[in-house]
Structures are given as structure tokens and as C-alpha cells.
Amino acid sequence: MKRLIMLMVAAIVPLSAALAPTGADAAVHHGGDAASTVCSTLPVSAPPGAKIESVTAAAHAGGTVTFPDAPPLPTPAPITDVPAWCDITVTLTHPGANDHVNVKISLPRDPHKWTGRFQATGGSAYLAGDFGAPLVTAVKAGYVAAATDAGVGSSPIDVSGWALAPDGEVNTPLLKDFASRSLHDMAVVGKDVALKFYGSPVRYAYWNGCSTGGRQGFAEAQDHPGDFQGILADAPATDWDRFAVATLWSQVVFNEEKTYPTQCELEAFNTAAVKACDDLDGVKDGIIDDPASCHWDARRLVGVKVLCEGKEITITAADAEVVDKIWAGPVSPDGEKLWYGPNKGASFGYLAQVGVPFFVADNWVKYFVEKDPRFDTTTLTYRSFAQIFRRSQRDFNDVIGTGDPNLSAFRKAGGKLLSWHGQADELVPTQGSVDYRERVDRLMGGDKKVDDFYRLFLLPGVTHCGGGPGPQPTDALGALVQWVEKGQAPATLAAATTGADGRPVTRDVCRYPQVARYTGHGDPAAASSYRCVTT
């Protein structure tokens, strides 16, 4: 689940932090292996309901691959020891849709460097797929890799060029492409290109994505359960029709309560919450291990003085009321819970900046729900917010909701779904992943049966798609591969980071609903000093 341009205005947090990791389209190559397979265009079979418009090919020498600057995003780090590869770009259309969808497939040119695996990669915010670093990374690991632009271009933040049709209505064909149609097309085309390039079929197909890419992975499991044997879908923006409105909630609260705390004041509440709930796992490490069990109330900070920009400020009851409402998440005027807020401990820097609405939500409401680019989302009231929320559900759940808990067909196909979500995610509320998993549990026989094909891991102290003070996953895709190909289901997910003292910190993250607890002995920085328990 981005970028900014419109957000650049007052971002306290760098824009890059709001986006799933991406790379630029172009790459520069230095040296590399000699090619062993001819890189040229080949005949591509059109997916059902689509027509191939063009096929192009481009050979790359490999070696060290660098990427150009693409502000405001960070430049991806150079990737070394990349084998020579071939890019096949397929452009297709869906008759009557007036769309032009590009699918880029990257293939190791030496057949001996191909593992027989296919990896489709996901996007970020309103970017359906990244044609740069993710593909090169996958090629280095021996995959045939693919990405799609869904026909909506290469900007994760600007939907003005495609969201609305000339008549001012939502461009439904392109929204369908962005939501799910292009993902299935990519799977079909990517496997077909691999077969014709090597003369051998793909043995194992995987999805790999975070944020929007996570939502896309769940869309594939729900809508096209046979496309992938393994799906890695992290920090997923599922239930998009709700999430994409709910993340405006802080603006509504500020507007209605007429209280406008600074980021310094807001983060004082987070600091206090972390201090109060830090030792829930038995260790004081500056991280709330299980925010759902942190019942600290913002009102406890009322009257406390905090230093902000050299000035002493006293926290008021109005400040506390605003913070508690943001943490609780959106509700209707009659008190019905609509969706979730950020966890305690997650930064307020993106979802709660006064007068600066989260750009994903801002664009969604302006272009898709209201169909009016001039609509001001900072003026929403509790009542108008609830009305927009309901309209988004009514008009878009079937198109892009991605909240269907019925994964029966995916289970029957033998698929495996692995998802992790940071407990300090500042963009996509972690409880959305918990809500979805619990709906699947209720529908499909309980957590033990669901664990046979779908596992969720909640990572303490980890921010959106990685980052933050908590241990980061070391090889989630590798864990998924072991599950799919060897039948070794991950009981825990290995994670690691470097502590403030420079020492390595490791954790074996427990699968939901379990949480980690310190055993009372051993090095608190070592994974072996913790056990998984059900609270």
C-alpha cells in the first residue's frame, strides 16, 4: 500500500516511506555473462478476452545493474552478479475497453540459470507493477519475473490521467484492469512466454507483493485461484473499498473536533503508549509486541508537559480525545464501527497530518467516489464521511474490494498463502489483516484448518512493507517456497535487525494468533529466548 507529489507539501515523514519498495523502469548494466539464448520476439497467446497488440524484446548483459534516480522515490541500490537476461514486453487490449496493458517478462538468457520458477511482482499505491528492481532481483534469484502496468501508467500517486472517462464517469475498464484483470493476464502471458522461450513449462508459480501488491496477491487467491501455487502478500490493502476511505478518518476528527495537534504532540502519545505497553512480551525494547493487548488510554497524558520545537506544551483533554478517536478508527454517527485505525506505536506521520490527507485516500474519494478532482477531503464531517464510506462500499466492493473470505477454490487448487504485516504499519492498519484472517477462519472451519493453506504473521515494531525498529523478515519468499515445494509449513517466520547497541537481534515471529513471550532467561536479543503463546 506510495508516493506523493500532492503530499510533498507537508510531509514530516519522507515520501519514500509511504511506498512499497520499487525501482525505476530503466537500468544501466556494467559487464555480465555472455548470452546463451537468443533474445527476440516470439508468438504470444492472448489470454481469454484479450488481444495481443505488440511484442518487443530487449537483451541485457547483466553484471552490476544500477537504476536512475526517480524522485521523490529513493534510488534502488545496485544489484550485482545479475545473469544476462531478456525482457519481453507484451502489449494487450481487451476489445471494447479502449485499454493498452503492458506486461514485462524478464527471463535469464541461460536456461541453466532458470530454476523453473515464475514470479509475478506487485505494485504500490496506484502503481500496478514496477518494471525495474523487482524484476532484476527475481532474475538474479533464478526466476522468470513479470510485472504489469495494468494500462494505467507508471505513477503511484497520480490517477488524473486514467481514473475518469471523458464523460466524467469512472473509467470502469481501467479500474478493472488495475483491480484484478491485468493480474490474471500477466500470469497467463508470463507462463506462456517462459514456455516458448525455454521450451519447458513453468514448474512453480509465485506471487510476490506488498501494500497494493499485497492486495493484488489476495485478489489472485480469491478470483484466479489456479494462477499461483504460492502467494506472498504482505501489508495488504485488502478491503480496499473501506480502507481507501477509512484512512481519511483523522482529517474528519480534526475538522469535527476543531483540535489540531502537531506531529510532536501526537507522537508524545505514541511515546507514552510504547512506554506503558513495552514489556507485554516480558522485555523492554522500545516496541509494543502486541498492540491489540495495549489498553493504555490517551487521557492518561492529559496535563503532561511536552517539549515541541523548544516550547513547553501542556497536553489537553481535547488532544487526548482526538488521539483516542484516531486509534479507535472510523465510526458512523450512530457509533457503528466502520474500519480500523493505526495501532498504538505506529507513526501518525502519514495518516494524521493536519490538513494533509493521505494521498491514496484523497485520490480515491476525489476521483472514484465523488468523481470530482476539486473535492476537498479536509472538510468532511462525521456524517458526510459515513455517507462517502457507504458509497465506496456500494459502488466498488465488487470491483476492487478484495475482501472475499471464501478461499475454498484456492485451497482446493493446493495453493499456499503467506502474509505478514508490521504491527507498526503507519499506512495500512494492521487490524485489517487480522479482520480478514478471522473472517476466513469463521467461514472455513477455524484457524487450524485455515493454517493448512494460509498463514498470517504480525511483526512487532515493523512499519509499512518493512522498516522500523522491529526485526524484519529475512526470507519470507524462501519460507513460502519451502512450503509449496517441500511441504514445510512455516511455524514461525525468521526475522532479524541490528539493535541500537549495534548487536544483532533475531526473532522467530509467531504465526497469528500466537504472540511471543520472553522465557525469562537467555539473551533477550536472541530468538531462542522466546516462545509462542496464545493470549
Task: Please state what every model-predicted region is.
Residues 219-221, 226-331, 458:
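A catalytic-pocket lid/entrance helix-loop region that shapes and gates access to the active site
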Residues 99-103, 129-135, 150, 156-161, ...:
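Short, solvent-exposed loop/turn and secondary-structure capping segments
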Residues 74, 115, 124-199, 245, ...:
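Cap/lid segment of the alpha/beta-hydrolase catalytic domain
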Residues 4, 26-116, 132-133, 284-288, ...:
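Catalytic-loop region of hydrolases
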Residues 328-511, 516:
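C-terminal subdomain of alpha/beta-hydrolase-fold enzymes, centered on the catalytic histidine
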Residues 209-219:
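Glycine-rich nucleophile elbow surrounding the catalytic serine of serine-hydrolase chemistry
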Residues 200-211:
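Alpha/beta-hydrolase fold nucleophile elbow
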Residues 1-26:
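Secretory targeting and sorting signals
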